[in-house]
């Protein structure tokens, strides 16, 4: 059992570049990961992405943001709950407001994942759980045939 008392965890910056910036307070878990997340005003979470193995969910604590999917955008506010099943539609959070957007993020982590990025045409194979796992990112357009490069094929 692990107990994290309110206000005792350390915040750490997540992946950042350009319009992408959020920070996270890891709460722990083995198969079910949990973390407090804060998305700064005018920023986006991660690029539009879809997990093929990991299921994610979030519960909005404060602030407002929009969730972007291939079907459009939906505004989110305190008390809203979202679930993103593995293999489900791509998603991204966008905070176009003036206040931080805070949420509890949950993920069923299995130590590996395949993640698609529709906007950039990339695909990532992830070994290990976020944030310490290794990522191998490729452009989908540069796919190779199964036997490419094999001298015996």
Predicted regions span which residues?
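A generic structural motif
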Residues: 45, 55, 62-64, 71, ...
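Ligand-binding loop in jelly-roll beta-barrel domains
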Residues: 86-113
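A short, N-terminal "cap"/entry segment at the start of jelly-roll beta-barrel domains
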Residues: 1-31, 114-153
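Short hydrophobic/aromatic patches on the structural cores and recognition surfaces of FHA
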Residues: 63, 79, 93
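Short acidic-glycine-tyrosine-enriched beta hairpin
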Residues: 70-88
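Short, conserved beta-strand element in jelly-roll/cupin
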Residues: 36-40, 50-68, 106-110
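Conserved short histidine dyad/triad with adjacent acidic residue
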Residues: 18-22, 35-51, 86
């Amino acid at each position: 059992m692990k107990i994290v008392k309110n206000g005792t965890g350390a915040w750490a910056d997540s992946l950042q570049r350009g319009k992408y910036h959020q920070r996270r307070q890891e709460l722990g878990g083995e198969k079910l990961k949990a973390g407090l997340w804060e998305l700064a005003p005018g920023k986006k979470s991660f690029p539009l992405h879809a997990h093929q193995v990991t299921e994610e969910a979030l519960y909005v604590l404060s602030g407002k943001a929009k969730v972007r999917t291939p079907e459009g955008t939906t505004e989110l506010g305190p008390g809203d709950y979202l679930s993103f099943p593995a293999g489900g539609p791509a998603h991204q959070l966008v905070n176009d407001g003036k206040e931080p957007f805070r949420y509890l993020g949950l993920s069923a982590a299995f130590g590996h994942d395949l993640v698609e990025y529709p906007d950039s045409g990339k695909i990532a194979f992830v070994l290990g759980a976020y944030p310490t796992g290794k990522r191998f990112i490729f452009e989908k357009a540069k796919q190779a045939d199964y036997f490419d490069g094999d001298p015996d094929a």
